[in-house]
Amino acid sequence: GRRPCCNECGICDRSLDPMCICEDLVPQCHEGCQACEEVDTGTPMYQCRSFEYYHCGTPCL
């Protein structure tokens, strides 16, 4: 499948094809996110807290 973009990747593992935690707050978690947490910012936003494959640094539209 296509990898979700991520503006700001946080912790990544050290493999050649790293899995990362994305720090972005999004209206809904991407399909395949294993640990989606709601973040209260006044409007319901979500953050994927599991290690996933992303296109890091790709501007998200």
From Swiss-Prot:
Function, in words: Serine protease inhibitor. Inhibits trypsin (Ki = 41 nM) and weakly inhibits chymotrypsin (Ki = 410 nM). Does not inhibit bacterial subtilisin.
GO process annotations (BP): negative regulation of endopeptidase activity
Entry's Pfam families? Bowman-Birk_leg
Which residues bear the site annotation Reactive bond for trypsin? 14-15
What name has this protein been given in UniProt?
Answer: Bowman-Birk type proteinase inhibitor B5
Record's keyword annotation contains Disulfide bond: yes
The entry sums up its family as follows: Belongs to the Bowman-Birk serine protease inhibitor family.
The record's keywords, sorted A to Z, are: Disulfide bond, Protease inhibitor, Serine protease inhibitor
Q: Which GO terms describe its molecular function?
A: serine-type endopeptidase inhibitor activity
- Mind telling me which GO cellular component terms the entry cites? extracellular region
Disulfide topology: 5-60, 6-22, 9-56, 12-20, 29-36, 33-48
InterPro entries cross-referenced by the UniProt entry = Bowman-Birk_prot_inh, Prot_inh_BBI
Instruction: Fetch the Gene3D superfamilies from UniProt.
Output: Cysteine Protease (Bromelain) Inhibitor, subunit H
Q: Which organism is it from?
A: Hyacinthus orientalis
What does the tissue specificity note say? Expressed in bulb (at protein level).
